[in-house]
C-alpha cells in the first residue's frame, strides 16, 4: 500500500536534512524524574560529538508514557542541561505533540496488513529471547476481551538479520510503543547519529526491524558507558542522591560536575574542573573524537 503523501513529506524532509552532510544528533530523555549522573554523562557525550562535528544537537522529550511523567520534570531537564552548559538547537521537541504523526503511521501499517493483535502478557513472554509468534496467525482479535485490549505487533520476517521477532508498536494500554515513536522521529527529524547509553543497545535489533519495514536507512548508533553506584548497579532516577540537586547541595559547581562526567567517559582524571566548552576545546586540540574509541 502506498505511503500517504503527508507521511512521505515527513520522510522526505528528514532525508533532505540527512543528505546535506550536516551532523544531526539529539538527546532524548524521558520526564519521569530528575536526570541522574548517568543520564547527564550520556547528554555530555552526545553534545560533545555534535559540537565537534559542527552539527545540530536537538533536545527531544520522550513523554508519551504519560502515567510515568513527573510534574515539572521537563523544565528541570532543561534547567540541568543549561546549568552544565549543554546548549541545544531550536525549541525542545515533545513527543506528546506528535501523537498524530505516530497514529498515522500505525494506521498505514495496519491497513497494509503489517500488524497483528497480540494478547500475550509480559509475564508469559518473560525470559524469551524473541517473541515466539504465538498470536501471529490470528485469533487474538483487535477489540476488548476480558477488559483488555491487545498490543499491536509489526510482522517481522523470520529471515530478518537482527532476529528481533515481531515488534510491539502499540502497547496494550493504548500508548504508542517506544520502538515505533523513536524510529519515526529519527527519520522525520533527519537524525544522522544517535548517542545513548549502553543499556539501550538491546533495543537496536527491534528498531532496525522497524527501519527495514519502512525501507529506510537507520542513523549511526553510538552507545556510551553507564555510570554505576558503589554496588555496580546502574543508576536510577529513584535515587535522589545521584542527581544534580544532591551534588549542588554538597557545594559542587558546574565545572566540578562536568569534570566528574568527563572522567566517567575517560576524558580526564577524577577531580578535574572545566566547563563543557573547555572540555570540547581540549578534546579537539588533542585530536580525540568524542564517542569514538
Swiss-Prot record:
Co-factor requirement: Zn(2+)
Keyword set, alphabetical order: Aminoacyl-tRNA synthetase, ATP-binding, Ligase, Metal-binding, Nucleotide-binding, Zinc
TM ranges: none
Motif 'HIGH' region: positions: 29-39
Residue sites binding L-glutamate per the record: 26-30, 62, 178, 196
Pfam families the UniProt entry points to: tRNA-synt_1c
EC number(s) stated in the UniProt entry for this protein: 6.1.1.-
Residue ranges annotated as motif 'KMSKS' region: 234-238
Gene3D superfamilies in the record: HUPs
GO BP field: glutamyl-tRNA aminoacylation; tRNA modification
GO terms of molecular function: ATP binding; glutamate-tRNA ligase activity; zinc ion binding
Cofactor stoichiometry and binding remark: Binds 1 zinc ion per subunit.
Ligand binding (ATP): 237
Enzyme class: ligase
Binding positions (Zn(2+)): 118, 120, 131, 135
Domain of life: Bacteria
Stored InterPro entries: aa-tRNA-synth_I_CS, Glu-Q_tRNA(Asp)_Synthase, Glu/Gln-tRNA-synth, Glu/Gln-tRNA-synth_Ib_cat-dom, GluQ/Sye, Rossmann-like_a/b/a_fold
Parts forming coiled coils: none
Family label: Belongs to the class-I aminoacyl-tRNA synthetase family. GluQ subfamily.
Chain's role: Catalyzes the tRNA-independent activation of glutamate in presence of ATP and the subsequent transfer of glutamate onto a tRNA(Asp). Glutamate is transferred on the 2-amino-5-(4,5-dihydroxy-2-cyclopenten-1-yl) moiety of the queuosine in the wobble position of the QUC anticodon.
Protein name according to UniProt: Glutamyl-Q tRNA(Asp) synthetase
Taxonomic source organism: Parasynechococcus marenigrum (strain WH8102)
Organism placement in taxonomy: Bacteria, Bacillati, Cyanobacteriota, Cyanophyceae, Synechococcales
